Amino acid sequence: MPSFSGQFSSALRYEQYLATGTQEQQRRWMQVYDVAQLDATQQQLIAGFQREMKILVHSGIWCGDCVEQCPVIQRIAEANPAKIDLRFLEREVNTELDEELRINGGSRVPVVRFFSEDGLWCATAGDRTLNRYRALALKRLGPSCPTGILPPEKGEVEATLADWLNEVERVQLMLRLTPRLREKHQD
């Protein structure tokens, strides 16, 4: 996989990215952000992260799936900003990545890529977590895309948060256990 360090350095932090949306889009994102809360155990887990990680989200400010997942990822990142550096790239502006980030043959968002402290690719996840797919399967079939107009139910947000936290923790453990970084940090 090619290096995306240039994209990362030009990507936006959450607040900057949110500001690119319309007032209505911002409202939708904030609804989910307000519902997404880490419990004490989750906060303690994230606070214990020892390796720096970079998370780059290829997103669409207009996208219902992004509305329902990206604020959750922000909640995780802000629980340990010294170790988690989260940035966003707008799909409509950064079309050069479309071919490389296709999922199941389609241009989908969000696509979340995880990098080590020194910019090496570790993992890619997207466009929906397992619990997001389960919730959508219960609600509908067909080609329509969620609009994000109605906020997801609290239990759905909690399940999505747990899915993303599992992925972030998996990558953190990968970084913590890799011989290359253990040697570098002498631990």
Regions found by a protein language model. Give the residues of each.
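Thiol-based oxidoreductase modules, predominantly thioredoxin-like and allied folds used
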Residues: L56-S59, I73, P81-L97, R108, ...
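Non-globular targeting/processing and membrane-anchoring segments
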Residues: M1-E52, R75-A82, D98-R108, W121-D187
